[in-house]
Amino acid sequence: MKYYMIAGEASGDLHGSNLIKEVKKLDAQCEVRCWGGDLMEQAGGRLVKHYKDLAFMGFIEVVRNLRTILTNLKFCREDILAFQPDALILIDYPGFNLRIAKWAKKNGFKVIFYISPVILTLKKSLSPAPIP
């Protein structure tokens, strides 16, 4: 199977790396493409973007980096389309992952929130698929 994982901060990188290790125990031939960090890469994921290139905190910093954020969203969508994963696994990182989830769901990709953002309780249309 092919998995695409997105984690946007250090804690997500840790959780993502543990998930990659467990998935690889069950399916040694699986492919994992990811946005995350060094831990996810060391666990066997093919790192596309490092979370250090994605972290913008605060209103002013987000506004200053809006072009970069929009470019990252576009690149992520294109990369998912090119990779055609069996499942898209999102690890927290709500500002980015909720936008990707909405797009992915509309485009027929299976979306799994491994650690879902708290805001999901308010967004019924983005209800996460449970992990079996």
What are these model-predicted stretches?
Residues 1:
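Nucleotide-sugar donor-binding and catalytic loop/hinge architecture
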Residues 4-132:
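Active-site and donor-binding regions of nucleotide-sugar-utilizing enzymes
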